[in-house]
Amino acid sequence: MIRLQIVERPEANLFKVLKRAMRSGELRTFSLEKAGSRVVHVRSPGYMKWEDTGGVLACEIRTPREEGKEWQLLTNFIGRVVDRFPTLVQGINIQVDAPPPEPPRKRRKRAARR
């Protein structure tokens, strides 16, 4: 899972602008699901849950079917936002959750010889 925070410039309304662009077809490779609370990409696996928290877009990227592929949606989304809306973005913060460690292997006990 990757967490992403996009800090918008004052009075930018980046969340509304992005939702409008996705719904109108200006951003053709992205679409909204679940009443606009989830973003999906045409080719990248997974989805991004997002919400507006007063000047900061809080996003969480997940790929439940293909673990470790979050980076594809991340690069597509950041690239598109920075390319199309550079005047609305002030900063981007990315936080990566490390995968849980693998459990140690259990050793089998040998059968006793008789």
Please tell me what each predicted stretch does.
Residues 34-60:
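A short, structured beta-strand/loop element
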Residues 10-12, 64-67:
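Helix N-cap motif at beta-to-alpha junctions
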